[in-house]
Amino acid sequence: LHREYEPVIRINSQSGKGGAAVVLQQAVGYNLPKEMHPEFGNIVKAAADAYGDELSSKQIVDLFKKEYIDLQGKYALVRHRFTELNEADGTIHSRFEGSITIDGVEKYITGVGNGPIDSFFQALAGVGITGYKFVNYHEHAVSSGSDAQGICYIELKKENGEHIFGAGIHANINVAALKGIIC
């Protein structure tokens, strides 16, 4: 009969935490870390309730991009540069220099840390953006080739103990991480 079979996963307000993550993996190759499933699952459930019906794969992908990738929030990365500092004793530090916008106002920031993420956190602290502890990150390619795009999932812990997540996509995985932090 030569018919193609495409499995269907139905996502509605009663779906479990991992259903939306499975859809993202199958539709666009995003492998959300398990720790992120509940947060995104709640976002999908709220959207399904508001819509009053099941969500399509496209709607779920669009929702993920809106909530994590294309988010227009309080902060935005404008430009940056990393410099590696190699000490005589073998210690390596990373220096972040760049600018971000805070509520539309551009601010120059700089920080030094043990790597790109730490130096970015130090730079953010320099302009009073504190109260977040870096917990974890996961990254993987979403395309192939030496110019592949990578996605980075960031887990932060707020001072009140709440865990929150961000995600960023870029060909430079360091930039993907910064986007995931600042979103």
Which residues make up each language-model segment?
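Terminal or standalone catalytic/regulatory effector modules within metabolic enzymes
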Residues: L1-C183
